[in-house]
Regions:
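N-terminal intrinsically disordered, cationic/polar leader segments
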Residues: 1-172
Length: 172
């Protein structure tokens, strides 16, 4: 089995724009939400293939783009989407992993099962070498849960990707 070709670029432009073509409209939308919340520009393209291959390839491609720019090394965010509330914390690690309390069951959103999100986030974490902690604080609607998670992941990545400013001493 050959790996699906994919490419991602991240620009720290403080604008949150996204051009995403994975072949899965729901994943395209979620990655665009991630970029908006993180206030960075994402260009992500995945060659046509199966849905499973596209999800993993997209996560890996974004992970490669993230690891190339990971500066602060950590970030966290708690963000809502309607009734859902997600908490995300991440840090640079020797071996990336996804740690979550979310039940990514067989619920369907936009024609795909919600486990798509788990596979994407796991591929992102492993490829970017980050420990990605995702906690669902509140939420019942699967679409809102995924939106809250991706927004919180984006905001946490936005923190981790920003250059750390050196301490500035002020004369008194």
């Amino acid at each position: 089995m050959s790996e699906t070709r994919s490419e991602a670029r991240i620009t720290l432009a403080h604008e949150g724009a996204a051009t995403v073509e994975t072949g899965l409209p729901v994943l395209d939308h979620l990655v665009a939400e991630l970029a908006r919340a993180g206030r960075f520009r994402v260009a992500l393209e995945v060659a046509p293939g199966s849905a499973d291959e596209a999800v993993t390839a997209a996560g890996r491609a974004l992970g490669r783009a993230v690891t190339a720019r990971l500066d602060a090394g950590s970030g966290w965010a708690m963000l809502p989407a309607d009734e859902a509330l997600a908490l995300v914390a991440l840090e640079h690690a020797a071996e990336g992993r996804l740690v979550t309390n979310v039940d990514f069951s067989d619920e369907r959103v936009g024609g795909v099962t919600t486990d798509v999100a788990a596979r994407f986030l796991e591929a992102l974490a492993v490829e970017a070498s980050i420990n990605l902690h995702v906690r669902l604080v509140e939420g019942t609607d699967p679409q809102h849960v995924l939106a809250a998670i991706f927004k919180a992941v984006g905001a946490a990545l936005g923190q981790a990707l920003r250059p750390v400013q050196p301490d500035v001493e002020e004369a008194v």
